[in-house]
C-alpha cells in the first residue's frame, strides 16, 4: 500500500480550491497552518506535489463549512483543458474526440495520480471511459474527487465539441448531492448518480461524437 505521507499529487488543482474558498471569505491561512504548507512556494511552482494525507485534510477542512457543499462541483467547473498543464495543451491538438480521450487515458496518472483511466467499447460500439481510484481514499475525499472529476470531464469535453451535437452520458458511483440541480445546468452531458457498482466515473460517447473534429 502506498504511503499516504509521500507527495504524489500535483498541487495545481488544490491551489484553485484555495482561490474558491478565499472568494467565500474563508480563512486560507488557517488551512495552510493546519497542513503545514507554504502557499507562496506552491503558487510559484504549481507542479509541486502534495501527499494523500494532506489532500484528505484539505478536503476535510473545506467541507466542514456547510456553504462549501458544492465546492467539488465548482472546482470541476473551473478546470479547463489548459488547467492540466502540458497534457491539456496536447489534448487541444488532437484530431478527434476519440484521439483526445485516448491521450487522456494514457497520461491520466500525470493529471491525477490517485485515479486511473481506461477505455473499452461496448456492444453498441460506444466508447466507455472509466475513471477509478488508484489509492485508498477516505469516503469524503473520494466522493469529493469523483464529483469534481466528473464535472471537469464535462467541462473539458464541451471545450472540444459543438453544443448542438448529440448528448453523452456520465455515470457516477456517488449519490446525487444536495446541489444536484446544478448538474441540470451543464449542457450536453446527462449525469446518472448511484449508477456504478464500484467507486468511480464512466463516460459513454457515441461513434458520431468520437469522430467529431
Residue map of PLM features:
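N-terminal low-complexity or simple alpha-helical regulatory segments
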Residues: 1-127
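Alpha-helical bundle regulatory/interaction domains
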Residues: 97-213
Amino acid at each position: 500500500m502506498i504511503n499516504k505521507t509521500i507527495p504524489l499529487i500535483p498541487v495545481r488543482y488544490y491551489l484553485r480550491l484555495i482561490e474558491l474558498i478565499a472568494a467565500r471569505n474563508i480563512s486560507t491561512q488557517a488551512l495552510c497552518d493546519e497542513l503545514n504548507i507554504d502557499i507562496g512556494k506552491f503558487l510559484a511552482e504549481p507542479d509541486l506535489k502534495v501527499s494523500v494525507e494532506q489532500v484528505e485534510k484539505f478536503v476535510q477542512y473545506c467541507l466542514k463549512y456547510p456553504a462549501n457543499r458544492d465546492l467539488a462541483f465548482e472546482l470541476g467547473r473551473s478546470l479547463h483543458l489548459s488547467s492540466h498543464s502540458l497534457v491539456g495543451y496536447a489534448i487541444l491538438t488532437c484530431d478527434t474526440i476519440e484521439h483526445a480521450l485516448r491521450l487522456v487515458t494514457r497520461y491520466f496518472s500525470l493529471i491525477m495520480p490517485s485515479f486511473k483511466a481506461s477505455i473499452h467499447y461496448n456492444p453498441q460500439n460506444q466508447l466507455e471511459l472509466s475513471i477509478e481510484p488508484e489509492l485508498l481514499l477516505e469516503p469524503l475525499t473520494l466522493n469529493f474527487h469523483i464529483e469534481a472529476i466528473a464535472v471537469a470531464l464535462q467541462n473539458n469535453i464541451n471545450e472540444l465539441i459543438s453544443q448542438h451535437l448529440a448528448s453523452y452520458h456520465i455515470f457516477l458511483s456517488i449519490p446525487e448531492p444536495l446541489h444536484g440541480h446544478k448538474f441540470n445546468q451543464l449542457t450536453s452531458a446527462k449525469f446518472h448518480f448511484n449508477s456504478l457498482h464500484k467507486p468511480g466515473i464512466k463516460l459513454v460517447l457515441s461513434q458520431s461524437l468520437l469522430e467529431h473534429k
